[in-house]
C-alpha cells in the first residue's frame, strides 16, 4: 500500500493578537512549505462564523493557492453539502479545477457543528444533513457530463449542464467524510474515496475506521479502487515545553468550541459525529 502525506490546514484565531490578514499570510506560507516539501496535497475546509476554523469558501483559498504553489494537489476538506445547491457547487468546483490547472480534489461532508446548522439552515438536523449530502454527491458528475435533470427530495431542476466544465476527465476526484459503515459503503458505491477523522479514542478508533473501510470495499468495491485518507492532528516544534503548552492551549480552545454552541440534543452544545 502506498502511503502519501498531505497538509490539512485552516486559519485559526485563538486570541486577538493577530489580524485575519496576518493569519491568512501564515496560512499561505505553510501551504507553500508543504508544496516545496513534496507533500501530495493541501486540504482546507468550509466553516462559518467560528474563529476555530476560518474558511467560509475553500474554493477561494484554493484558487489563490494555485498561483502560489506548483505541484501540490488542492482539496476541499470538506465542503458542507447541505449549504450548497448542486448546480452552484458543480459550477464553482469546475471553475476552481480550471484555475488550479486540474489539481482540484473535492472532499464533501454533511457538516459537523449544530452551531452552523442553526444559523445557515435552521431546523435541519444531522439526519437531514446526511440525506442532503447523499442527494448532492451523485448529481455532480451528472452535471459535469451534461444535460441532467434532477427530481429529488431537496432539489429539483430541469435539464442543466454545468458551465464551465472541469479540466479533469469525469471531474475532480471526490472524497466523502465517513464514520459509520453506511457512509463508507455510500462513498465506495458512488466511486468516491473516503476521508476519516479519529476523534477521541486514539489508535483503537483508527483500527475501527479502517475495519469499516475494508469491509465496505468487500461489499461495495467490486471493480473500484477507493483510497482512504486519515486526518491526524500534529504540531511541529523542537521544544518539548512548547509542544506541551501548545497542546494545552489548543485542547482548551477545542473543548470550549465543542461545549458552548447550542445543540438540539443538549443545550450545553455538542459536536455531532461527522458521518455521512
Description of each model-found segment:
Residues 270-276:
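Hydrophobic alpha-helical segments, chiefly the membrane-spanning helices
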Residues 2-22, 82-150, 194-195, 200-204, ...:
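Flexible, glycine-rich active-site loops centered on histidine and acidic residues
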Residues 64-70, 97-101, 188-189, 219-221:
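Acidic (Asp/Glu)-rich catalytic clusters
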Residues 259-266:
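Conserved small/polar residues in nucleotide/adenosyl-binding loops
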Residues 1-74, 169-172:
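N-terminal beta1-alpha1-beta2 module of alpha/beta enzyme domains
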